[in-house]
Amino acid sequence: PRATAAFVLRINEETGEPIFKYPMTEIGSQGFFTVKIEDSGAFAYKLITEGEQAAEFYDPYSFGYSVDPVNVMKVVNGDDGILSDFHVKDLFGARQITLDGVQGVSFCMNMPGATRVSVVGDFNGWDGRVNPMRRIDYTDMFELFIPGDLMNTRYKFEALYRDGNTDIFADPYAEVYEVAPGNASVLAKLEYSWLDS
């Protein structure tokens, strides 16, 4: 939303080297950009934005689900079979993962009654329009993979409800939180060497 220009950068899938830069056209004044690329088939790409929000990044929406939809459906349906081998942290909250060879963070949250859930944080100006999450079919669960190094950044979830109200809340599955009054969740890798046997 704070970009003044945007481009699709076609890259070599193996080396990541740039091949061609397609300019995008802004639609309206809300920072929504689009481009139609004719007859090129699927290709690897990054997005480039200029202006206040200048960046080069992989498109979060070009990746498949970062959580296993089968496990999501098992949780939704209350399948006891998943509980013997399942850890809540393996599905919900924020987890550092590698997806399609790209490192990033998987976000997943169950939000009954929400029409939109977004990840907001230091990395997107706390703007819920930047990283809206995808609803997993037939559930109230939302997920999104955000590529890149987000370690030591603060984040929360923003939910928009049918009545138009929004709520911003910390990740209940986070391991590290900002001190009050902010109370944001913090993406951090906890490493501790236990000394007992």
Residue ranges with predicted function:
Residues P1-A5, S40, N110-V117:
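Short proline/glycine-enriched turn/loop motifs at strand-loop junctions of beta-rich domains
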Residues L9-E13, D122-N124, M133, P172-A174:
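Short Gly/aromatic-enriched secondary-structure transition segments
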